[in-house]
C-alpha cells in the first residue's frame, strides 16, 4: 500500500473495467512520470467527456448532441433497426459497412443474478420507437444483435417474445457464425458482416 494521493490514484484506476491492481499501479506510476502538460491534456479530455458527452435521446448511443450522428442522418434506412447491448457494439457493426439502418442500444443485457431485468434496459423505448414510427417511417425489421453468450441469448429470446406479434414487423437474429460466449465488439468485420447478412427470421 502506498500513501496519500498515489494510493488514491491507484484505487480509482483499479475501478476501471479490465484493470487489476498491478495494472492500476503501473498506469499510476506512468502518469507520475509524464510531463505536466500531458496530464493537463488528459484532465481536459476527461472533463470534456464528462460535460459534453451524453446518450442519444432516440437510440441510446453515445453522442455530443441530443441526437447522435446516425439518427440524424436522413440517408440511413429508418425502417431497419439493429438492437445491440452497448454503444461499443454500434461501432463494431459500423466497421462492417454492411448495415445502413439505425440502431437501438439497450444499455446492457438481461442478467437476473446481477439484478438486471427488462425494466433496467431500454426495451420500453424500443417498443415506443416501433409504435410511434421512426421519423414517420414504419419500422419493417428489427435485427437482434445481442452478444452470443448466456445473457445475450436470454435477452434475444425475451425481445422476440415481445416483438413477434407486432403486425407487419419482421424480427431477425444475426447468424450464429460468432463464437459462443464472445462479445460483438471483438468480432472481426468479415465475420460480423457475414452474421448480419445471414440473419435468420425468428418465429
UniProtKB/Swiss-Prot annotation:
Function: May play a role in DNA repair. It seems to be involved in an RecBC-independent recombinational process of DNA repair. It may act with RecF and RecO.
Keyword annotations from UniProtKB, A to Z: DNA damage, DNA recombination, DNA repair, Metal-binding, Zinc, Zinc-finger
Biological process according to GO: DNA recombination; DNA repair
Organism for this UniProt entry: Mycolicibacterium vanbaalenii (strain DSM 7251 / JCM 13017 / BCRC 16820 / KCTC 9966 / NRRL B-24157 / PYR-1) (Mycobacterium vanbaalenii)
Chain coiled-coil ranges: none
Protein's name according to its UniProt entry: Recombination protein RecR
Family recorded in the similarity comment: Belongs to the RecR family.
Listed InterPro entries: DNA_Rcmb_RecR, Hlx-hairpin-Hlx_DNA-bd_motif, Rcmb_RecR, Rcmb_RecR_Znf, TOPRIM_dom, TOPRIM_RecR
Keyword Iron: no
Zinc finger motifs (C4-type), residue ranges: 56-71
SUPFAM superfamilies xrefs: Recombination protein RecR (SSF111304)
Entry GO MF terms: DNA binding; zinc ion binding
Domain Toprim: 79-179
The keyword Heme is assigned to this record: no
One Pfam family this sequence matches: RecR_C
UniProt-listed CDD domains: H3TH_StructSpec-5'-nucleases, TOPRIM_recR
Domain of life: Bacteria
